[in-house]
Amino acid sequence: MITLPARPESLTFAPQQSALIVVDMQNAYASQGGYLDLAGFDVSATRPVIDNINTAVAAARAAGMLIIWFQNGWDDQYVEAGGPGSPNYHKSNALKTMRQRPELQGKLLAKGGWDYQLVDELTPQEGDIVLPKPRYSGFFNTPLDSILRSRGIRHLVFTGIATNVCVESTLRDGFFLEYFGIVLEDATHQAGPAFAQQAALFNIETFFGWVSDVESFCHALSPATPLSLAKEKRYA
């Protein structure tokens, strides 16, 4: 068992009965020229997030945690995205961008394309699970719940993009299914202005889960990992 310093309080769990979830670290969300960038969102600050996710993944894997990678998107004909009868058709900024710029049709979030691929710096390894998802929540129309329950996993540590969209949506759905959700705030990034990140983290720590950071996570998994005095005081 480990005790992870977090807000609003520390959380104790067994790493071997927990999962680290990496949400949508695709070129679409983290790279210049990807969907978010083309849709007008700022992705310039994603580099530290990628590095922090790599650090968290390495620590989790060494501790025996299951690593689950999500990729958001659809078939290249966008049948899975839903037609005009689906709210997703009207609210997905990727679909709206392609309607505004027809030359991008078949390129944004299409399975098999560059936009859909995970960024080069993040590579799943043998034993990890990679799951496609067609909507914001990783629980919708995916086997995530079955995968977790069959392994006795109840604690989920979240990283990825976007904090205020797919990360929060998946954590919220997990809360309703009796999962304990923890977000590593410096291993996530928002879609939109900075206040969207802060609002999502406020919602999570106040109503749906817990908020921690990569340094505290790594130190909890391996106490030999140094923890700064500032972090010790932060969660005291």
From Swiss-Prot:
It catalyses: (Z)-3-ureidoacrylate + H2O + H(+) = (Z)-3-aminoacrylate + NH4(+) + CO2; (Z)-3-ureidoacrylate + H2O = (Z)-3-aminoacrylate + carbamate + H(+); (Z)-2-methylureidoacrylate + H2O + H(+) = (Z)-2-methylaminoacrylate + NH4(+) + CO2. It comes from the Bacteria. GO terms for molecular function: hydrolase activity, acting on carbon-nitrogen (but not peptide) bonds, in linear amides. The active site is at residues 24, 133, 166. Keywords: Hydrolase. One of its GO terms (biological process) is uracil catabolic process. Its EC number is 3.5.1.110. Hydrolyzes ureidoacrylate to form aminoacrylate and carbamate. The carbamate hydrolyzes spontaneously, thereby releasing one of the nitrogen atoms of the pyrimidine ring as ammonia and one of its carbon atoms as CO2. Belongs to the isochorismatase family. RutB subfamily. This is Ureidoacrylate amidohydrolase RutB. It comes from Klebsiella variicola (strain At-22).
